[in-house]
Amino acid sequence: MRCVPVFVILLLLIASAPSVDARLKTKDDMPLPSSHANIKRTLQMLRNKRCCPGWELCCEWDDGW
């Protein structure tokens, strides 16, 4: 009967412990791109599709993006 309070206290301590990501980072781990970077990349892709092929000046003058 003496073990029950100790067991309950241990359970409470384990449940309140902060969670930690136990996985080690490797050299292959890369951070996910932010949503700002995704939007910027999408707008750049759309701008490249709108540009005149073979004449780069039409893209340089278009600063509306």
Curated annotation (Swiss-Prot):
Signal peptide region: 1-19
Modification comment: Contains 2 disulfide bonds that can be either 'C1-C3, C2-C4' or 'C1-C4, C2-C3', since these disulfide connectivities have been observed for conotoxins with cysteine framework V (for examples, see AC P0DQQ7 and AC P81755).
Residue numbers covered by the propeptide annotation in the UniProt entry: 20-48
GO molecular function: toxin activity
Keywords tagged on the record: Cleavage on pair of basic residues, Disulfide bond, Gamma-carboxyglutamic acid, Secreted, Signal, Toxin
Localization, UniProt: Secreted
Protein name: Conotoxin mr5.1b
Natural source organism: Conus marmoreus (Marble cone)
